[in-house]
């Protein structure tokens, strides 16, 4: 299941931008 979530997150990040990557890094 984690794999599916990762794919969704990756898609959202690609849409939002690098910025989002920082937020995810802090969360994950």
Swiss-Prot record:
Q: Where is the Expansin-like CBD domain?
A: 11-28
Which parts of the chain are coiled coil? Answer: none
Q: Name one GO cellular component term.
A: extracellular region
Name the Gene Ontology biological process terms. Answer: cell wall organization
Q: Where in the cell is it found?
A: Secreted, Cell wall; Membrane
- Entry annotated with the keyword Ribosomal protein: no
**Membrane topology note:** Peripheral membrane protein
What does the similarity note say? Belongs to the expansin family. Expansin B subfamily.
Q: What does this protein do?
A: May cause loosening and extension of plant cell walls by disrupting non-covalent bonding between cellulose microfibrils and matrix glucans.
Specify the protein name: Expansin-B1
Which organism is this protein's natural source?
A: Pseudotsuga menziesii (Douglas-fir)
